[in-house]
């Protein structure tokens, strides 16, 4: 019982609803005083918020922002952790959205992000040094935390990541995962 204008057959036939959702997000962000750009994601009904100049400058409630780490096969190896320290989306190809809710592609609050792909607000930087034993220095185009002075295995990186996430939340900050922040390791 589908016809050409049916939303069951053609999701684009209700673009007015998706545009209204986008406008609602723009209004919400404007009411918070956040300078942002809202865009449709690849999946209609899901949106991308781009903070101007970046999330740490705009959102005073965010202490850490981090992204995904891909292996040589473009599969997620790490990036986002749940409360138990499990790495979410591990093994997913970078192009896979994570199912019907597309969580693997959406910015979201989380327990922790991987220390190898993170940025911190000013107030979290001394905590980084306290936990890791190395000073917080931003490096590269994405200005990620330089972890070259930290020598540990995968489990060690996970432990440090969880400690930083816990410390941020104890200080009242959010930890945000953004899949657009991506690095590749071999």
Q: In which residue ranges do the predicted regions lie?
A:
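Conserved donor NDP-sugar-binding/catalytic core segment of glycosyltransferases
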Residues: 53-87, 174, 181
């Amino acid at each position: 019982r589908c016809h050409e204008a049916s939303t069951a057959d053609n999701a684009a036939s209700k673009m007015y609803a998706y545009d209204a959702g986008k406008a609602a997000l723009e209004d919400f962000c404007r009411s918070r005083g956040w300078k942002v750009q809202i865009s449709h994601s690849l999946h209609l009904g899901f949106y991308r918020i781009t903070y101007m100049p970046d999330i740490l400058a705009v959102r005073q409630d965010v202490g850490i922002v981090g992204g995904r780490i891909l292996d040589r096969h473009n599969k997620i190896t790490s990036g986002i952790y749940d409360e138990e320290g499990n790495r979410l989306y591990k093994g997913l190809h970078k192009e896979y959205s994570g199912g019907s809710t597309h969580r693997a592609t959406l910015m979201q609050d989380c327990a922790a992000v991987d220390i190898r792909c993170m940025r911190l607000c000013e107030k979290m930087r001394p905590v980084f040094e306290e936990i890791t034993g190395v000073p917080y220095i931003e490096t590269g185009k994405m200005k990620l935390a330089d972890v070259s002075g930290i020598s540990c295995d995968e489990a060690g990186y996970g432990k440090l990541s969880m400690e930083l996430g816990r410390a941020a939340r104890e200080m009242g900050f959010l930890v945000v995962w953004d899949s657009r922040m991506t690095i590749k390791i071999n």
